[in-house]
């Protein structure tokens, strides 16, 4: 019961210089595997060339997958650069990772999962949202279980309900300073400093840990009663 899962979007980032595999959950699972842990990617791809190529790349990297092929196109993100070189992202909707099914195999995986990392982006659709929430609810209860919510606020693909339900189910929250400002506005406490907001979230959702990244200004790790800081 030591499997570590990255659950959510698996897609192609289509860049000006070509395409590369993207998706935070897949990236998480890959890096975990490089430390020798039993990791899995849970997602969905289409029955198309893009989907098969994702499966082939993961196989080449020896990354274990539980990826369903569904009757929707494989997800893509069109990445363009504006006049000053700032990237702009167009995340396609109605794609495979919006339709991750909850299967018997996925239920068995949930029962043997020690840690899972999930985000808000893959919950923009009702199908994948229900699957992710059901997976989290199926995992065994226990102090050793780790449920990491890596908030990923993109293109307005989130609601207060999605954020509340995700934070209620997680025990570790990873968030950046810009996302924290957005979350604070949604929940109605914008007038206090970033650290105070973190303490509020830690207590409100009974979190084991909250990780706040602040770009070039370093990172903070909050646990009940203790905060640590690391330079970038």
Question: Which role does the model predict for each range below?
Answer:
Residues 1-63, 77:
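Glycine-rich phosphate/adenosyl-contacting loop at the front of the ribokinase-like
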Residues 2, 191-232:
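Conserved phosphate-binding/catalytic region of the ribokinase-like
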Residues 32, 176, 213:
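Short, conserved phosphate/pyrophosphate- and ester-handling motifs at nucleotide-, phospho-/glycolipid
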Residues 108-109, 165-166, 203:
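Structural alpha-helical scaffold elements that stabilize or flank donor/cofactor-binding regions
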Residues 115, 120-200, 217-219:
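Conserved beta-alpha-beta core of the PfkB/ribokinase-like small-molecule kinase fold
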């Amino acid at each position: 019961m030591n499997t570590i899962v990255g659950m959510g979007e698996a897609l192609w980032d289509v860049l000006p210089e070509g395409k590369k595999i993207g998706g935070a959950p897949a990236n998480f699972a890959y890096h975990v595997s490089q430390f020798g842990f039993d990791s899995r990617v849970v997602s969905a791809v289409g029955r198309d060339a893009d989907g098969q190529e994702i499966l082939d790349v993961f196989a080449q990297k020896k990354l274990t997958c539980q990826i369903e092929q569904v009757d929707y196109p494989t997800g893509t993100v069109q990445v363009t650069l504006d006049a000053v070189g700032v990237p702009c992202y167009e995340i396609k909707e109605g794609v495979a990772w919006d339709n991750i099914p909850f299967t018997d195999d996925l239920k068995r995986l949930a029962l043997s999962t020690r840690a899972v990392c999930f985000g808000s982006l893959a919950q923009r659709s009702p199908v994948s949202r229900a699957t992710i929430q059901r997976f989290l609810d199926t995992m065994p209860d226990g102090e050793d279980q780790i449920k990491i919510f890596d908030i990923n606020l993109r293109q307005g693909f989130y609601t207060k309900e999605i954020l509340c339900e995700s934070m209620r189910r997680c025990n570790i929250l990873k968030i950046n300073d810009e996302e924290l400002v957005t979350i604070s506005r949604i929940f109605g406490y914008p007038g206090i400093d970033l650290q105070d907001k973190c303490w509020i979230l830690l207590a409100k959702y009974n979190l084991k840990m909250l990780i706040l990244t602040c770009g070039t200004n370093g990172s903070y790790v909050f646990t009940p009663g203790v905060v640590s800081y690391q330079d970038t």
